[in-house]
Amino acid sequence: MKKNIHPDYKLVIASCSCGNVIEVNSTLGCNINLDVCSNCHPAYTNKKREAATGGRVDRFKKRFSFLESSKAE
């Protein structure tokens, strides 16, 4: 490698919201905050998340349910 043409590498700490801390080398030099890492991501942990059971149709029916009750009377 040629001298004095490559950028300086600095130690960067990437901290996840789950508390996991990863140390990496980077030319940026600023710390990184992560939302998801390999310790807490469902694809890596094989944990399934519960999806929202109701959809747009359920929200619509709930919002306009007062119209059906007035028709029945």
From Swiss-Prot:
The reply on keyword Zinc is yes
Spell out the GO cellular component terms annotated for this protein, sorted alphabetically and separated by semicolons. ribonucleoprotein complex; ribosome
Cofactor(s) the record lists: Zn(2+)
Q: Which residues make up the binding site for Zn(2+)?
A: 16, 18, 37, 40
Tell me the cofactor note: Binds 1 zinc ion per subunit.
Q: Which Pfam families match?
A: Ribosomal_L31
Q: Which InterPro entries match?
A: Ribosomal_bL28/bL31-like_sf, Ribosomal_bL31, Ribosomal_bL31_A, Ribosomal_bL31_sf
GO biological process terms, alphabetically, are: translation
A GO MF label: structural constituent of ribosome
Family stated for the protein in its record: Belongs to the bacterial ribosomal protein bL31 family. Type A subfamily.
Subunit arrangement? Part of the 50S ribosomal subunit.
According to its UniProt entry, the function of this protein is described as:
Binds the 23S rRNA.
Q: What is this protein called?
A: Large ribosomal subunit protein bL31
Q: Which species does this protein come from?
A: Hamiltonella defensa subsp. Acyrthosiphon pisum (strain 5AT)
